[in-house]
Amino acid sequence: PTPQLTGGYSKEKALSQTADLTIDWDISPLWKASFTGGRTWSEGGPSMNFRMSAKPRRKVGNDYLSGNLYSAWDLTGTPSATFSPDLQQQLMNGIAEVDTGSTDSSWKRTEVKQNYFQADVTKLFESGWLDSIQFGAKYRDGKVHRNTGNTYWTCQGRDPADYKDGRYQAGCDPTAGDAQPGFFLSNPISNIAGGFNANVFPGINYPAYIDYLNKTYGGSHNRTEEDFVYNVNEKIYSGYFQANFRTERVRGNVGVRVVRTKQFAQSSDSIEKFNDYFLDNASGAPMACTDPAAAAYPTYSCESGFLRLPYDLAQSKTYSLIGVDRTYTDVLPSFNIAWDITDTLVLRGAASKVIARPGYTDIAAPGALSYYSEEYVNDRRVAGGASTAGWVGQGSNKQLEPFKATQFDLGLEWYFQPGAVAGVGLFRKNVDNFTLPVVRDTPMVINGEAVNVQRYETQANGRDGVSQGVELYGQYTFDFGFGVQANYTYNDTNLASIVLDGQEIGSSPLVGSAKNQANVTVFYENEKFLARASFNRRGQVVGGLNNGLTVYTEPYDQLDLNVAYNLTPDWTLTASVINATKSEQRVHLGSDTKARLISNTYAGRQLYFGATWKF
C-alpha cells in the first residue's frame, strides 16, 4: 500500500560549558610567555525521538479497503509524487492503519569532555634577519560517550520492563493498528517550500497521537540500549618550534610540529536475526486471528489480522563490546615566505604537511549485522512492509588512518591601487590518506559461516590522491564605497585507490573535491550603511563509493544578501537572506547518468534579523 506516511517527533536539549584560564607573562622586553588551560564539557540529546508510520488502508473482514488508488512519481528535475486526489479525505474517513512494525523510537545522547593545557614562548630579536623564535607544547585529553535508547508504551497489565513483548507495537493490543482521523492533520501540508512536489501531502499529528498513547497506555517509559553505545578517548601530545624571519623585502617562517596521538575507540557490535514474524497455520501460511487453531495460543498477539510470534521465537540478538587502541606519531614541517618584488607586487610561497584525525563516528559508531529470512520477509509483506532477504549491515572502521597531506602553494599578488588587488595562485596537495563512505556487498564469516552482507556501509581510506590547480582572485573598491570581489578556482584530481581491510576495493576521485568553484561579491559601504550580495557556485562534488559507483553532488549555486545600518555608534541593525535563489541540492550515483537519484535537498530560504549594542 502506498504512500506510507511517516515522520518524526523529537524533544531535546543540550548544555555546553567551557572554562578557560590564560596567563600572559612578559618575562623581559625580549621574552614573552603564555599559558592556557581549560576544560570544556557538554551533554545533551533527545528525551523523546519518536517515529510513527501509517498506511491508507483498513482491514475489513479478510480484505483490505484501500484509501489510495493511484501512485506515481517523477524523479526528473525536482522530484514529484502524485496520489489519489481524495487521499486526505479518505484518511479523515478512517481508512487508515498504523504500521506498528515501522512505528518506534530511537534516540542518542552524547557526553563530551576535554581537558587541555598549552604553553607558548616567544623570543624577540632586536636586529638581524631573525625576527623571533616561537616554541611550545600542547596537551589535549578528550572523551566521548554516546548511548542510544527508546521511548515506549506498554499494554495495560504488562510489565513496564518488558520492552520486547510488552510494547503496544509488539501485538499485545490487537487494536494498536487502528488509526483514528485525529492521528492526522486535518488538512494536507501545503507549504512545501522545495526539494519535492506532491499533489497531496497528508501529515501526522504527533501531539495528538502521543496524547492518545499516554491516555491509552498510561504514560511512556525510557530505556537505555546497552547494545548500542560507543566510547572514544583521545589523548594528543604536541610540541612545536618556529623561526620567523624578516628582511627589507622578504619575510616568512619555518617550523616543525611533532604530534603524538593515543586513541581508544570502543563500540558495541551486534548480530541480529529476524527468523519469523507470524505463526504459521497447517498449510504454512500466516495464521489468521480468527482461525479456530489460534485459541491454542492465548498469549500470542494479533497484528494485521494474524497471530504474531513472541520476540524470543521470532528474533535473536547478540552483541559484544569491541575496542581498539592505536598510537601514532607525525612530524609536520611547514614553511611560508613572502617577497615584496616591488611596492605593489608580492610573491608568496608555502609548503607544509598536515593531518586530520578520523571523526569519532567513523571509528566508533556501533556496528550491526542483520539477517532477514525468507519467512520473515514474506510475513512482513503480508503486514505491509518488507526488507530484502539475506544479510545487511553497517559499522565503523577502527583501523582508519588519519587524513595526511603534503601541500604546496605559490601565489602572485598585485596591489595596483589602494583597495584593489589581483592575484593568481597555484596549488598542489598530495593526499596520503582520506576518509570516504563505502557501501558494497561484502563477504564475511559470521559465527563460522561464510555469508555475503548486502550493501554493507562503512568507512574506508583513499590512498595517493592528488589535488592541483589554479586560483584567480581580485577586489576593486571605488572611491564612493562601491566594490566587487571575485574568486575562481580550478581543481584537477586523480583517481585515488580505495583501501579497506588492507585490500584495494576500487578507485575514486578525491572526496569533497569540485573541479570548478567561483564566488562573486558586490558591496556598498559607508559610515552608516553596508549592503552585500554574494553569489557562490560550486561544480560537481565527489562523494563516497556505493556498490562500485561514485556518489556525486550536482553543481550548486546560491545567492546570499546582507545589510547593516548603524543607528548610532553603539547600535547596529542587521538583516540577512540566505539562499535567496531557493536553490536545491541534488545527489546522484555514477558518472554515466544523472538518473540514479539519491536525494534532492532544499535547506530553505532563511531570513535573519538582528541588533547589536556595543557598551
Regions found by a protein language model. Give the residues of each.
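C-terminal beta-signal and adjacent terminal beta-strands/loops
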Residues: N536-G544, L561-F615
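Outer-membrane beta-barrel transmembrane strands
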Residues: T2-F50, M92-T151, Y217-R251, R257, ...
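Membrane-embedded beta-barrel scaffold of Gram-negative outer-membrane proteins
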Residues: V346-R348, A356, D362-A364, S373-R455
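Flexible glycine-rich, low-complexity coil/linker segments exposed to the extracellular/periplasmic environment
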Residues: P1-T2, N62-G101, G149, R158-E226, ...
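Flexible, surface-exposed loop regions and adjacent strand-edge segments
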Residues: F50-K59, G149-D159, R223, S268-F278, ...
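Transmembrane beta-strands of outer-membrane beta-barrel proteins
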Residues: P29, A33-F35, D131-A137, V250-V256, ...
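Transmembrane beta-strands of outer-membrane beta-barrel pores
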Residues: R39-E43, M52, R109, K113, ...
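Gram-negative outer-membrane beta-barrel transporters
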Residues: L426-V431, T435-N546, T581, G610
